[in-house]
Amino acid sequence: FRNGFTAEVRRALVRCFEQYNAAITDYHRALQEAAGQTPSKTGPLRWFYAEGEDPTAYDQAPGFERLAHTVPANQTLAVAMTSAEHKLATGFYDFTVFALSDWKAERKRGLDGLAFSVPRAFLLHRPAVFQAMFNAFAEALPTVHGHAGFAVNVPPMDRRPNEASEYFYARRFGPGIDVGDPMRSNVRKLFTKIKTVDWLNALDADLVREVGGASSLVLPPDWFIREPLKNGGLLIQAGAAPESGISNGPGKPVVPPAAYVLLNQALRPIVADKLDTLQDGTLDSTAPLLSTVVATEGWLHRFNVPEDQLNLWWVELHKTPKVTDERTAIAEQTRKLLERMGLPVEPRS
């Protein structure tokens, strides 16, 4: 997104965090009750990280709202909050904001970023809530592009030593798992391209025009949900649930999800085909990583298939669950969330 140095966008970020924190706190307490425990007064977040400061226990930290309002526009706002048990560890819950200073933004040093995560079980026990957060947050911010699906959380303070694990899980479970820091500089400098397609996708009006407009996208409504994003943008859900990949038998590479392959084909003009490295690793690391341009480009191309094989992927798509049953629930959850955030509510299909 853009303009994270402005008071208006900072307020929108605070509203996004408030709704995220409310959703995960409600879920956290429900899990405690189900386990026969007394629900805690707080949610699952445990650690607070701010630019230039040591990690602070979440309940002793100044809080995101305060920093969002007090960090001046000429300074970068960089904050992360996690459910990690230790400050050097990671957790299932993570809310991270990186917003450039005004002078860096004016010099086009990159876009700003918001990343948030929940455990996989959250999607099952709170159906449509994560999709609603993605949709509403994209609407609340001056979004350029965004995506959501499966990924591996790594410690905010110790990313490089854990990149090998991130890469291992992506290789083990499939190409549907995202790799790399979403706040990485080369990713934030994608103004006219997107890093990847995913389960949930957000595109601004300029990107939609680059692919020929929303009406040009051949995405059957039984398997894809499309909703308008403000000012001509588009929200796209590919498939009923996020997927890492499809098993192709013992000893064979995991096959990418059909919905992702077909969405990648539809958005090919705006999907990045080259990028600087997605990982760095450590000086003594010998594990395979996306730490070379060649490896990174191989990952960027992982959903590309020959034109003469596309019909096979359409056949595979028809074997997957349809999105028709959850379309109404997502629209309703999104409407409620937009209302709570004080945003205009447009009719959704």
Model region roles, listed by residue range:
Residues 1-38, 156-349:
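C-terminal interaction module
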Residues 36-170:
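Internal, hydrophobic cores of structured domains that mediate oligomerization or house catalytic pockets
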